[in-house]
Amino acid sequence: MNLDLHRNIRIQKLAIGVERAPLLVIDDVVANADELVEDAASTVFAEPAGFYPGIRAWAPPAYQQLILAKLRDALLECLGVPNGITSGITSGLLRFSMCHYSLVTTPPEKLAAPQRIPHVDSLAKNALASIHYLFKASLGGTAFYRHRKTGFETIDESRNEPYFRSLRDENLGPATLGPGYINGDTDLFEQIAKQDGAFNRMLVYRRNSLHSGCIGSDFVPDPNPRTGRLSINGFIDLV
């Protein structure tokens, strides 16, 4: 697959909430996004381990190489590395530790409790998550949250125990959580930022930011990559 950045690529550098965690919003990412959709349509998907509410398949190496090479400076800035200078800090190399085509296929009423609240992907501050939307219908984007009781917008190792202790104390249950995907303010969480899903838009944020997909109660799962809620989800590490 021959991929390149779109000539009209646009990068917005935003900050989330009171804690000002970084967020990149990148529109018109690749020049040939439709080829990614067709590639996904010819790929075998499977249910992964963990709590992802759908099915996944490996994204092509050419995609990973393009993103790491052409967006390196923006990614390093999102990691808090000034001007791309990594000498004395790390090797300066970026790598995808995970990069998958992803399709949300779990109906709202079938979600487990952890899938109905915002989550973090890791406790590491210096690790990124990316989501590249590859659907053209109005199927929702991604939102970021503050836990009301603790005030936490990000969860690191020092916050992990008090955060989950607080959740246990709040006695999470069906009535507390609501019947489906979180999609706005609740008694437990305040939505502090939201980005709509748009074809060929990518979000990049730190993996310890509390976040969730914006998926409505009327969401109808579709396992077809050409018509379903297809994205490329990745974890990017500085090594």
Residue ranges and their predicted role:
Residues 1-204, 208-239:
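Fe(II)/2-oxoglutarate oxygenase catalytic core
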